[in-house]
UniProtKB/Swiss-Prot annotation:
Protein residues bound to Mg(2+) 2: 314, 318
Annotated positions binding (2E,6E)-farnesyl diphosphate: 277, 314, 318, 455, 458
Organism: Cananga odorata
Protein name listed in UniProt: Sesquiterpene synthase TPS2
Cross-referenced PANTHER family: ALPHA-HUMULENE_(-)-(E)-BETA-CARYOPHYLLENE SYNTHASE (PTHR31225:SF93), OS04G0344100 PROTEIN-RELATED (PTHR31225)
A GO term for molecular function: magnesium ion binding
Residues binding Mg(2+) 1: 314, 318
Length: 561
């Protein structure tokens, strides 16, 4: 039961049956996954549906230079802080990374903490922490009264409250004032929301749903462009550039998805493996959340293939495969040889063949750049994942319920996030050095914390289908059996553990790193995707509703004049 592909939603029983002495027969389960909500839509896209005209591209390039001029003139004023924030939230910050980083250095070195404007202080704090500067949260002490409570006057400052709310989610374990800020601002924003008007009300609703720090960047940009165009004090040049750039970038994303959809269709996975979830488009959207910028195009193509093949593997281990067959598949993956396919049942051969072909193609391309060593790291990580899946299948067969400690130690691998994080480095450029792969394979604190977020977010929204078939116990069930708690008590505790894991992620982001932030950001972005997809149910498996709407916003709908 891998984290990234859990199934459905239900309450977990408040008690766990005793560990069975007899092995259960696993495999050949019947799970009614809905078919792809996209069909062949992206596989048959025409050039007209994908391409953006040259006039649009030229206009976007001209506007880009206009925005660049604005950045050359930035100082440390609130107006300039707002400009940088708007550029990033509108999704065009990737064009100006050097200029923004230079501006953030100036802002940090200015040490200007004297402002009594809550919005200004919170915005400065958030931007600096987003860029890795470990500025002190003591700057917010000035907003408390003599009783140690946040001043009552702050309740009237909705923009300030919203900025403070967003900033508070970049806290670490040492930032107790930010924990207090989350409680205070959440209560106040919920209280005033019914009395607000757009666009401010839309910003508040968006933030209360998922805070900015935990949002998928591309989806956040799509929302923010629509909200920003209603702002009275909007920057028209910046707004037009953001819309055009969104359309230009969407064109590239459509082309990538079209190629991947044809690969998926040519392999005929959905028809030949009817027990799997047909979710190629959702997989691409997932990886678009990890990196959307043009320079990561190859990385998206490679990682989407990996995650979609991992989804097939997960359904094989979790739903369809019998234990003796899963033993054979695990051995075949350990060998990484075509000859190993002879030992597999016919239905496993398609997946195994596609996996070997994909990895061989990756290796051939990377060899031309002297980067073939990356594949050995991938094979190592993927083999560990297969072994972890097999161990969970054995647990399910034996009706074994581990302790939470044993479960979580195992889940660091079976969550699939270590292998997916490493996979996201395969197609990257020079930043993904051998040292970066060593960092990823050795499970650093950042990846451990992200695995906790992903594992527990999944298990809190544990699936109804999990309860309808033989399955490995979830973290919730493990804890309930071990401690005799209720479902509600356990979920509350796990949400606290998720919050603590995010604080560790934030700490790792700001502390001196073994690898560049460009590398660690891939791992952090995986956690952001999970925060979105597992807010209240498994929106990967059940992708016909909100998931489809969000994918359409990013990959179908263009901005028009």
């Amino acid at each position: 039961m891998a984290l990234i592909f859990a199934n459905g939603h239900s309450d977990v029983p408040s008690t766990q049956p005793p560990i069975g002495k007899q092995k259960k027969e696993i495999g050949r389960e019947s799970v009614n996954y809905h078919p792809s909500v996209w069909g062949d839509r992206f596989a048959i896209l025409t050039a007209h549906e994908i391409e953006v005209d040259e006039i649009t591209k030229q206009r976007a390039e001209k506007l880009k230079h206009d925005v660049l001029k604005m950045l050359h003139n930035v100082s440390v004023s609130l107006q300039d802080l707002n400009l940088i924030d708007e550029i990033q939230r509108l999704g065009v910050g990737y064009h100006f990374e050097t200029e923004i980083e230079n501006a953030m250095k100036r802002i940090y070195n200015s040490r200007d903490n004297d402002d009594d404007d809550l919005h200004a202080v919170a915005l400065r704090f958030r931007l600096l922490r987003q860029h890795g500067y470990n500025v002190s949260s003591d700057v917010f002490k000035k907003f408390k009264d003599e009783k140690g409570e946040f001043k009552a006057s702050l309740r009237e400052n909705v923009r300030g409250l919203l900025s403070f709310y967003e900033a508070a989610y970049l806290g670490t374990a040492d930032d107790t004032i930010l924990d207090q800020a989350i409680d205070f601002t959440t209560d106040q924003l919920k209280s005033v929301l019914p009395n607000l008007n757009p666009p401010l009300s839309e910003l508040v609703k968006l933030a209360l749903d998922v805070p900015l720090h935990k949002r998928i960047e591309r989806l956040q940009s799509r929302y923010f462009i629509s909200i920003y165009q209603e702002e009275k004090e909007r920057n028209e040049v910046l707004l037009e550039f953001a819309k055009l750039d969104f359309n230009v970038l969407q064109s590239l994303h459509k082309e990538e998805l079209s190629q991947l959809s044809r690969w998926w269709k040519d392999n005929d996975f959905a028809r030949k493996l009817p027990f799997i979830r047909d979710r190629l488009v959702e997989c691409y959207f997932w990886i678009l959340g990890v990196y959307y910028e043009p320079r990561y195009s190859r990385g998206r193509m490679m990682t989407t293939k990996v995650i979609s093949l991992t989804s097939i593997m997960d359904d094989t281990y979790d739903v369809y495969g019998k234990l003796d067959e899963l033993e054979l598949l695990t051995t075949a993956i350990e060998r990484w040889e075509w000859a190993a396919m002879d030992e597999l049942p016919d239905y496993m051969k398609l997946h195994f063949s596609a996996l070997l072909t994909a990895v061989e193609n990756f290796e051939e391309e990377l060899s031309k750049e002297g980067k073939a060593y990356r594949i050995s790291y991938f094979k190592n990580a993927y083999t560990k994942l297969a072994k972890a899946y097999l161990e969970e299948a054995r647990w399910a067969s034996a009706d074994y319920v581990p302790t939470l400690e044993e479960y979580m130690k195992h889940a660091q691998v079976s969550s699939a996030y270590p292998v997916l994080t490493l996979s996201s480095l395969l197609g990257m450029g020079a930043t993904a050095t051998k040292e970066a792969f060593e960092w990823a394979i050795n499970m650093p604190n950042a990846i451990n914390a992200i695995s906790v977020v992903c594992r527990l977010k999944d298990d809190i929204t544990s699936a109804e289908l999990e309860q309808q078939r033989v399955h490995v116990a979830t973290a919730v069930e493990c804890y309930i059996k071990e401690n005799g708690t209720t479902y509600e008590e356990t979920c509350k505790l796990f949400k606290q553990k998720v919050d603590s894991a995010w604080k560790e992620i934030n700490k790792e982001w700001m502390d001196p790193l073994q690898v560049p932030r460009e590398i660690i950001k891939r791992a952090v972005n995986f956690a952001r995707v999970i925060e979105f997809l597992y807010r209240y149910k498994d929106m990967y498996t059940e992708s016909a509703g909100e998931t489809k709407e969000c994918i359409a916003m990013v990959l179908v709908d263009r901005f028009v004049d």
